[in-house]
Regions:
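Structural detector for short beta-strands of small beta-barrel domains
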Residues: 84-107
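A broad structural signal for short, well-ordered beta-strand segments within beta-sheet-rich domains
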Residues: 95, 119-120, 155-156
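A membrane-cytosol interface segment of integral membrane proteins
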Residues: 124-162
Length: 162
């Protein structure tokens, strides 16, 4: 389901997002320092206000973009690394349900999936897994025997058994 190419693309996207946050913030902080130094040299009483405003804007811009753009991309990169190189566990059972609703699981958008590993109608044998919402929905019919390869409870691959 996941390939090394997916990880390379995610890391490239993370790099682009970091640049869009770091560069303008660094320019804003450099401008704030330049205004502060120029104000001290000219003994200006109001230069510190401009310097403070520039600093607040630069830091605010960075914090906003970090929370909205960088952190989700970083979380997805860690997720992909876990799926590709992390320890995986195989579980076999009956594919019981797939939720069309998207939920948040460890910062990632996911669909909930239910797999029954024991007696078909015994709810104590149900296992909940999470399917990455960025991947196409599984093309496996409900009630089919499946093999799920997972890291924690996030699905790395799912195949139908005959």
């Amino acid at each position: 389901m996941y390939t090394q190419q997916d990880l390379i693309q995610a890391l490239a996207q993370l790099k682009r997002r970091r640049l869009t946050a770091y560069l303008p913030s660094a320019v804003g902080l450099a401008a704030a320092i330049a205004v502060f130094v120029a104000g001290r040299i000219q003994r200006s009483d109001s230069a510190w206000v401009i310097s403070t405003v520039l600093t607040i804007l630069a830091v605010g811009y960075f914090l906003f973009l970090y929370g909205v753009s960088i952190k989700p991309a970083k979380t997805y990169c860690v997720f992909l690394q876990d799926m590709l190189t992390g320890r995986k566990r195989e579980t076999q059972g009956v594919f019981k349900s797939f939720s069309a609703d998207v939920c948040d699981r460890d910062g990632l958008p996911c669909h909930s999936l239910l797999l029954n590993v024991g007696q078909k109608d015994d709810p104590q044998d149900d296992r909940q897994f999470y399917w990455d919402a960025q991947m196409p929905n599984p093309a496996i019919a409900l009630g089919a025997q499946v093999k799920v390869e997972s890291n924690d409870n996030r699905i790395a691959s799912m195949t139908a058994l005959e």
